[in-house]
A protein has these predicted regions:
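Soluble FAD-dependent oxygen oxidases
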Residues: 1-262
Length: 262
């Protein structure tokens, strides 16, 4: 984001950037919508695609601890073009799994390489070699299609309650607790997620915008996704209990898109 145009509460039209109203620009980058009505954004674009190399590989839950330890070491030195997410739960996908594996506890590694697809296939290959996968849907696809690949998992009308915290480190103890909470989810549709951070996110200094987590290596997301209103209490409690437990591995800050304020 290079600049923002907005109308303030007193009707003044302003342009905010690093050189024009820089304090306002600082707040707009992460501080929400309380500064005025934004009428325009100026972004610096970067060419990606049209096709990218992607990874989506599923492993049995009993491999989560060892794989997260290997994952931690790999992403620390991975190319900047690699972004990834580990999510653990039952993941009952009818298209990917037969009846025997559909309701088995498992986890997935999803990744993308924002560069040459041939180079990306090589860069993402370690994610596919952490053990014997239950399913592997990795391959090349249009970048815009990859951006939508999880949309169908979150239909309108479902019940959702999510929270998050930035992790100071993906320590062995933190990994053990992630295993525990993934197995304890009351809904088969719920997941515990580990998001890889760093890269361009960390290029911006911690004090250069109103956005927390610039220096965090990982984000923990806890997603309760369920259908039965009678299960509200159990699912909300699971999320809150998980975050209360995982707070010892965090400075207490969170990603506002996964805030779960209620």
């Amino acid at each position: 984001l290079r600049s923002v145009e907005l109308v303030t509460a007193d009707g003044e039209f302003l342009r905010a950037s690093e050189t024009e109203h820089p304090e306002l620009f600082w707040g707009l980058r992460g501080g929400g919508g309380n500064f005025g009505v934004v009428t325009g954004f100026e972004f610096e674009l970067h060419t990606v695609g049209p096709e990218v190399a992607t990874c989506l590989v599923f492993y049995p839950a009993d491999r989560l601890g060892p794989v997260l330890r290997s994952y931690r070491e790999f992403v620390a030195d991975a190319p900047r073009e690699v972004s990834s997410l580990v999510f653990a739960g039952e993941l009952p996908d009818e298209e990917l799994f037969d009846a025997g594996d559909r309701h088995r506890q498992k986890f997935a590694i999803m990744g993308c390489y924002a560069g040459d697809p041939d180079e990306g296939a090589v860069a993402l290959e370690p994610f596919r070699q952490f053990g014997d996968p239950l399913a592997d849907a990795s391959g090349r696809m249009p970048y815009v299609e990859f951006q939508q690949v999880l949309d169908a998992d979150y239909p309108d009308g479902m019940r959702y309650y999510w929270k998050s915290c930035y992790l100071d480190d993906l320590s062995d103890e933190a990994i053990d607790r992630i295993e525990h909470w993934a197995a304890a989810a009351p809904s088969p549709l719920s997941t515990v997620d580990v998001w890889q951070l760093g890269g361009a996110i960390a290029d911006v200094g911690v004090d250069e915008s109103a956005f927390r987590g610039r220096d965090a290596p990982f984000l923990l997301g806890v997603e309760a996704n369920w259908e039965d209103p009678d299960a509200d209490e159990a699912n909300v409690a699971w999320v809150r209990d998980c975050l209360a437990d995982m707070g010892r591995f965090s400075d207490g800050s969170l990603y506002l898109n996964f805030a779960g304020f209620l």
